[in-house]
UniProtKB/Swiss-Prot annotation:
Swiss-Prot/TrEMBL keywords: Aminoacyl-tRNA synthetase, ATP-binding, Cytoplasm, Ligase, Magnesium, Metal-binding, Nucleotide-binding, Protein biosynthesis
Protein name, UniProt field: Phenylalanine--tRNA ligase alpha subunit
Subcellular location, record wording: Cytoplasm
Matches recorded under SUPFAM superfamilies: Class II aaRS and biotin synthetases (SSF55681), tRNA-binding arm (SSF46589)
Primary location group: cytoplasm
Listed CDD domains: PheRS_alpha_core
UniProt-listed Gene3D superfamilies: Bira Bifunctional Protein, Domain 2
E.C. numbers: 6.1.1.20
Primary gene name: pheS
Taxonomic lineage from the root: Bacteria, Pseudomonadati, Pseudomonadota, Gammaproteobacteria, Enterobacterales
Amino acid sequence: MPHLAELVANARAAIEDAQDVAALDLVRVEYLGKKGHLTLQMSSLRDLPVEERPAAGAVINQVKQEVQEALNIRKEKLETDLLNFRLAAEKIDVSLPGRRMENGGLHPVNRTIERIETFFGELGFSIESGPEIEDDYHNFDALNIPAHHPARADHDTFWFDAKRLLRTQTSGVQVRTMHSQQPPIRVIAPGRVYRNDYDQTHTPMFHQVEGLIIDRDISFTSLKGTLHDFLTNFFEEDLQVRFRPSYFPFTEPSAEVDVMGKNGKWLEVLGCGMVHPNVLHNVGLDPEIYSGFAFGMGVERLTMLRYGVTDLRAFFENDLRFLKQFK
């Protein structure tokens, strides 16, 4: 079968000429595929006398096996050469210093919340949380802000329907705590709150921490001492602090708390007051027996003052150049 010998010689030459696995696979298909040259030799057996077919078929199968072995050997060599090339090209000098691991850090708002929680935790306050989708009872009614109360107009509220809203303050957590626990109560409620406002000093979502103490014989003096110590600890300096008379529906008397800035001007930092008797009535506590104080602070506001940030929106823009300053 001289034609068969020529095919084998051509196949071996094509195998040796293949420079990569893809080219080698094309050679395999050309000679051993369904329509390959050697495969088609099997169909030519029908032209031989019956007595010659077994011997001729055995020769063709032997040749196909030899070509397949040559393909396997060439493929193994090509893969080995490729691996050696990659190892040489991609080798690592282990004596070089490794890549420095990029250290992350807490977001400045989270750092402030953690600092507040640590201070009040050392005073025996527990940390409570509540739903951000609130009902009007816990957000308004229980806090001495009934329907049509003018104070409701001060809250640019995101309403879902007539009864459900995105909470405008974390005071609802305090209401739930007073319903579920008996005095003495010491609790702070950090969390996200929502109001429809957006400018350099306001965002639609921001963070608050509100605090509450309910017990016997709680006085405004207790409130002043607690907040003065907190502000001194938070800003890490002996600040000049003043309490200005103010109005909140849920406290009486009420006050705004200011600190003296480095520029000689007063800066408002939080609001506070003695818990209003109506609020105590609403949660089933007798104001003749129990009293308490409450306070609330904007976390972003305190963070801006502590770190000298002038634009509140920078906290929410995820600019790494800004955030890396707080590591």
